[in-house]
């Protein structure tokens, strides 16, 4: 039945979202038009939507679970170290048992990577 939850992530400019998800995180663009990009990597998918109205209302935190956090961290650290979250810029073991780190873009969209 249900196979995947796919979020819409709103930005003032489509290029801001593509900078985080494509340039920093290595997602591929499956479709792009003037106000929408469908992105995907390793089965994780999202819609990047240009909408100043909704971007002003919502700056989400998104969590992506991974089975290879060390490899992913090294990749992002070499690709875009400036985007590592200032409060979560290295892999840390959390009290709930997960290992995590995060990235933060200039619009305050946060992506947390988690491995149990």
Named regions from a protein language model:
Residues 1-18, 62:
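N-terminal beta-strand motif that seeds the catalytic metal site of vicinal oxygen chelate
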Residues 1-3, 54-58, 95:
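Short glycine-enriched loop/turn motifs at secondary-structure junctions
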Residues 14, 62-110:
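Vicinal oxygen chelate
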Residues 15-24, 101:
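Conserved active-site alpha-helix within GNAT-family acetyltransferase domains
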Residues 24-29, 80-82:
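Conserved acetyl-CoA-binding loop of GNAT-fold acetyltransferases
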Residues 29-60, 110-115:
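Conserved short beta-strand elements that form part of the metal-binding/catalytic scaffold
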């Amino acid at each position: 039945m249900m196979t995947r939850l796919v979020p819409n992530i709103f930005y003032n400019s489509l290029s801001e979202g593509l900078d985080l998800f494509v340039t920093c995180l290595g997602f591929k663009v499956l479709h792009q038009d003037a106000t929408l990009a469908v992105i995907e990597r390793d089965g994780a998918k999202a819609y990047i939507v240009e909408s100043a109205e909704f971007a002003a209302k919502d700056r989400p935190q998104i969590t992506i679970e991974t089975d290879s956090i060390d490899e992913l961290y090294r990749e992002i650290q070499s690709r875009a170290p400036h985007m590592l979250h200032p409060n979560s810029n290295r892999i840390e073991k959390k009290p709930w048992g997960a290992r995590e780190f995060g990235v933060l873009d200039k619009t305050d969209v946060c992506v947390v990577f988690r491995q149990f």
